Amino acid sequence: MGKKYKNIVLLKGLEVINDYHFRMVKSLLSNDLKLNLKMREEYDKIQIADLMEEKFRGDAGLGKLIKIFEDIPTLEDLAETLKKEKLKVKGPALSRKRKKEVDATSPAPSTSSTVKTEGAEATPGAQKRKKSTKEKAGPKGSKVSEEQTQPPSPAGAGMSTAMGRSPSPKTSLSAPPNSSSTENPKTVAKCQVTPRRNVLQKRPVIVKVLSTTKPFEYETPEMEKKIMFHATVATQTQFFHVKVLNTSLKEKFNGKKIIIISDYLEYDSLLEVNEESTVSEAGPNQTFEVPNKIINRAKETLKIDILHKQASGNIVYGVFMLHKKTVNQKTTIYEIQDDRGKMDVVGTGQCHNIPCEEGDKLQLFCFRLRKKNQMSKLISEMHSFIQIKKKTNPRNNDPKSMKLPQEQRQLPYPSEASTTFPESHLRTPQMPPTTPSSSFFTKKSEDTISKMNDFMRMQILKEGSHFPGPFMTSIGPAESHPHTPQMPPSTPSSSFLTTKSEDTISKMNDFMRMQILKEGSHFPGPFMTSIGPAESHPHTPQMPPSTPSSSFLTTLKPRLKTEPEEVSIEDSAQSDLKEVMVLNATESFVYEPKEQKKMFHATVATENEVFRVKVFNIDLKEKFTPKKIIAIANYVCRNGFLEVYPFTLVADVNADRNMEIPKGLIRSASVTPKINQLCSQTKGSFVNGVFEVHKKNVRGEFTYYEIQDNTGKMEVVVHGRLTTINCEEGDKLKLTCFELAPKSGNTGELRSVIHSHIKVIKTRKNKKDILNPDSSMETSPDFFF
């Protein structure tokens, strides 16, 4: 019988609870099981079940576990399940005997009343009345045993241990909200507005920021629009999900900072930071490192079969693959799946009809698990958020960009490709095998090589490197015998290459490797075009072996000199060289006021395609001059934009390079979409265009512009730095990078995001008005070219 009890404890009790509740159980059982701080941190569910079996000989601690679960509102359903499982083991006869011991006057129970009897054992009526009395009695009546009052809540045990002290028996603790197990969808909606058991935690806690989402807009039950973001923070012993309802704190929750939080709320295993909370950066003597196991635990996503077993009311975070999307009038059903099963995610409000497709990954924040008819669903609530991780770009299926076979994709590391600068001479290029075939280079590779040579010459000469002789890195089709390399003078000065040129050369070498591999050139040995100072005497050409060994071959991966915060792990630099003509560019503007981060927008085009560009390196402003032809490489493709960062290569193309952009393509770049077209577009796309302001309304932190044309009206919602622009009814707004967001009535609205920009085109009578620095005035309708 003891073994059966242990099976219930482990397989149907501990196994199905989440990590936070398991840590809570360990804390509550710490006295009974003699768990020290290290054991509480390191023991897993199996080890705890073993200790419970040893300590509680009769039922392996099942009764104790049921009592704990009953005190946690989100686990009440699970407590009932465990009672029924315990009843099955004990049998009806033993249940009747137990009932007689408790209440000798009670009649023998039937099978159905046996369930209630078992419930009485774990939560007898007298105990319920006593608990109710305690709640009314005040502080004196609220004292209970330490083992029942010390979960490692963010403000209690967990945070205390993180700061080097054990939780006090009298520490005020927080309780998750009283989630009902009722499965009616109306109850789910009601649950969003029902007051939760919020516990104000005044004690300051020190945490490290692990990650944050972008700010997003949500709607309160009072139909008021507000902005928030989610974050994940950690101490040295545990992590916490945080709702940050004060977006002015975004800078604090940034860059792996260590911060101090006080006056926050705690509920649902979450922390809530609002306008009343205090957040400050920790001092230099308050730094600490979060163990990797805590970081990995914070990133962990539960398997779907485990979610199906969890109690209704749990809050869920995680990354799931989208299998199917069904859009209804007010809700969207996202069917997610993994290798263990499937589950529906119901999105409403800001989670309704987000732009995603099958194969994308959905990162869910703060979704509620609900059950109905033994079926589990994840339901979005007021603060829920979905972040899309797009599947592999379809362009990867293009033969031009498909991965090459293993032997074609392997090159030596940079150290073997001669990119070091030990002294002041140029290194003699490494030569290919002596007998390459005449088809060693394809025609496409020859074109690529020609482009690369031109590009490298321009870039290095532009950086100020003065080569005393012919440019030695030109490469081309190899003949049937090795070429004698062109050698520089024997005594160039030690300042032959500047540090800046060294960086340029390193970038160019990396870029050429990526480009030529992408084009399909098959180099049987080390890359021959690496350049750099060598020793004080010429090198004999280094010849690779006829059959290169795998010891010096490795799969080439693009190397980024700097990994900016804006680039997520799902985005990658595009290594292909893109020659474009600049059509227009905005002025530089500050998009992050506190850190004074600047950027500008641009529109560029090839001879058959137009691209919107976000440029985060304002030193490149001169490059993005209208009608100039430039070459761009190592840029990032995201959300329909090309993004240019400090690691991106941008250079002028030869003066004799001509590019004719069709007039129809130029017109398409400057056209403003009609409002009725916007209403039918996919929500989540980004919009540029010029619209007339029909009405302006300022409400709190937001400014609402009603724009109109001859096809309809739409609302533009502006937040943050753009709310102070000088704009009146009748003016025109040139909007850049505004997100098309869903709105009730399925009309949609345009919302400002962090990279949005507004240019005000004033009417003649207001021409002399002073404008906000974030905007500019223009009276000519020909604003694009």
Swiss-Prot record:
Biased composition (Basic and acidic residues): 134-146
The keyword Aminoacyl-tRNA synthetase appears for this protein: no
InterPro entries for the chain: DAPIN (IPR004020), DEATH-like_dom_sf (IPR011029), HIN-200 (IPR040205), HIN200/IF120x (IPR004021), NA-bd_OB-fold (IPR012340)
Effect on the protein upon substituting E222A: Abolishes TP53-mediated transcriptional activation
Residue numbers bearing the N6-acetyllysine modification: K45, K99, K128, K214, K444, K451, K561, K598, K614
GO cellular component terms attached to this protein's record: cytoplasm; cytosol; membrane; nuclear speck; nucleolus; nucleoplasm; nucleus
Gene Ontology BP, a term: negative regulation of AIM2 inflammasome complex assembly
This protein's name: Gamma-interferon-inducible protein 16
Record remark on domains: The HIN-200 domains mediates dsDNA binding via electrostatic interactions.
Domain HIN-200 positions: 189-389, 562-761
UniProt biased composition (Polar residues): 168-185
Molecular function GO labels: double-stranded DNA binding; identical protein binding; RNA binding; transcription factor binding
Domain Pyrin: 1-88
Modified residues (Phosphoserine): S95, S106, S153, S168, S174, S575, S780
Outcome (variant: K663A): Impairs DNA binding
Location of this chain's protein in the cell: Nucleus; Cytoplasm
Motif (Nuclear localization signal): 96-100, 128-131, 134-136, 140-143
PROSITE patterns listed in its UniProt record: DAPIN, HIN_200
Subunit: Forms homooligomers; isoform 2 can self-associate or associate with isoform 1 or isoform 3. Interacts with TMEM173, AIM2, PYCARD and CASP1. Interacts with BRCA1, TP53, E2F1, RB1 and SP1. Interacts with MTA1. Interacts with PYDC5.
Record SUPFAM superfamilies: HIN-2000 domain-like
Gene for this chain: IFI16
